[in-house]
């Protein structure tokens, strides 16, 4: 509430001027800032019908800072004219004055001065008239004295164009007496206490009306992490494109499904401890589809299905090793094997979004644990052209239009492509995904019919999130150093579809 003294002074002013009073006049009469008077009006309105206040707007002209300076010291052109002696003044010396550039231009337009470019000592400025009348200063002084009505609109607009005048809208209140008007402030109670009820003095108290429309205190609640917001958008995009979500509840996977089923040789560097987290307990898996396992073993060690294989001694002990899955393609392999067991093949489109784990060196764009997004399409006759078309459609829905494709090598896809997107924050191209056409050596041992092709792509969830939220360091998005305030403040992510 405003100061009680100001409230009572305002009420006394309304009492004296029975017909009403303007808040601007009250401000001037009491010698206080108008905003304080407005605050007093609001406080009195909160007390009930003590006063009635109607807001009104009025416009008036007032001088800018430069305008006030000119009203006191004269216009720039007048100052330039007065600075030129009878013998003239070198132009370069004139331009060094504070008002030199603007004043020279205006004085030339007014034909008060002339420039002699052929003068012996260099360009020199001379007066062309004996005396001048500083009309700009005179007009500004009229406005300063509250006589702006004496100026024509054209003159005001010219001064406004020179940024010497400004048209200001002032909001004020017309204040009159209310039905419960009194010059005495009666404190309103905000709470009904047990003591008031026990003593009965609540009957003499005046209570402040309860505002049922007031906003309550916002309840504390959970906030979605930016990753989860973007994950929701990705999931919606896949569903819009007609994909079915794959179950991804197995963080621990066997080397067979994670590597061998994908036609990745057991000597591949990615299977080394430097890139994979192996599980110590349970260390080995024992349940596999035996007929499928034998076909995988054969295509690795001897070849088949039109392939020479890798020609090495494939070991079941290596395939049994449990690990934290390094990609969700292991899930895709399980789903494609399940699809191959159906009596009749039907085209499918699968997707998944879940965590994967890699024993990588941490830096601004790499984590040991991150989310992989995977899309898989299986149908007859799919080619690299189909893959590129789906990728363009998919990434356009993400709002990522700056894309580059680069040929790559994957043991289980041929041809293969890496997908890069330009990161505005890092000012460089960042790899956001990998893609390719699954090899026959992977698909045919599963039991899928010849002629069926499977195109697939995968990307991380973290890097597109960094791009959309303008985050340069992945450790600011995920990990123990994340600022929780960022989670509270991060806006909803809308991918431009």
Curated annotation (Swiss-Prot):
The keyword tRNA processing does not apply. L-phenylalanine binds at residues 329, 372-374, 412, 438. GO terms for biological process: phenylalanyl-tRNA aminoacylation; protein heterotetramerization. Disulfide bonds: none annotated. Its cofactor is Mg(2+). One of its GO terms (molecular function) is tRNA binding. Its EC number is 6.1.1.20. Mg(2+) binds at residue 414. It comes from the Eukaryota. Heterotetramer; dimer of two heterodimers formed by alpha and beta subunits. Belongs to the class-II aminoacyl-tRNA synthetase family. Phe-tRNA synthetase alpha subunit type 2 subfamily. This is Phenylalanine--tRNA ligase alpha subunit.
